[in-house]
Amino acid sequence: MTNMKFGLGLCVVFLTLLTGNRAVEAEQIQPQHFLIHMKTSLAEDDAQICAGPNVAWALVKAGHQVTILVDASAVTSVTKGFGWFGRLVHSDTTALDLARLPERERVSLAEQMGVSLEEIPHQYGEYLGFLKEMGVTIYGNQTMMLLYNIDFDDVAPEVTPIALNRMVELFQSADRIIVY
């Protein structure tokens, strides 16, 4: 009986050591560089471009470095007064400036991020500025901007236009790439 208790005790100690080491390993996750590649404009699919900022915030909160690359048709969503009608009516705002975060999303973000509702942005354009203040770097594909005939001065101030070679560097240096 004593040998059985001793054996059982050793098993418990061994399992405790194993699970204890796993818990320590899980806590020591190294920060990574995430590149969020946002390619779909607000006009094409609002769910995709609007999900990117939420993921960016969650990654920053988890201690990761985050870069957002606005590409393809999404460059139109960060351009002031894009389109013929926009130039006449909203020449000083972007599509993201005009897109409000639904109240239920704001409430959910406040709960998930552990902040007050007052700290949550009201529009997606404001959200980009909020992320930039948190250390997120935001770039835009200047070649796509040229193809859409976008003047760099009309791009949201949070977005820095970059050339293709710089984009290649972003893709090569990222530990993980998330595409929206």
Residue ranges of model-derived segments:
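Bacterial N-terminal signal peptides that target proteins for export
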Residues: 1-10
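Bacterial N-terminal signal peptides
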Residues: 9-19
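Acidic helix-start/capping segments at beta-turn-to-alpha-helix junctions
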Residues: 69-86
